[in-house]
């Protein structure tokens, strides 16, 4: 068994995906070097009151050279939507077989200002 990890920041905060609609995703989680991340839970909260937001997840670590080669939206490994003022919960059953080699980057289908995007919590196992 590997390490159980999540993406809660040292300050208790979670990343919000807002304007990431071009070539650089929002970093949601960075793997420990040399380990892969197997998500078992993703909780996404849409803070906007009117817009369905589609999340596009890619396998990338934006801070390490060579680990961001697959950061483009066209390299999506998983997609899901979140209704306005709603929460999408994806469990181990939904995420079965999904593995991130470098980390999780996320794009938003629409450009939103801070406070109107999608906040994403991820938990899983690194091994």
Q: How would you label these PLM feature ranges?
A:
Residues 1-34, 47, 101, 108-127:
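C-terminal interaction-tip segments
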Residues 35-41, 99:
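Short, solvent-exposed loop/turn segments enriched in Ser/Thr/Gly
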Residues 40, 51-56, 115-120:
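Short beta-strand/loop motifs in extracellular/secreted proteins, especially
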Residues 77-81:
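Beta-strand-rich interaction surfaces with strong enrichment in secreted/lumenal proteins
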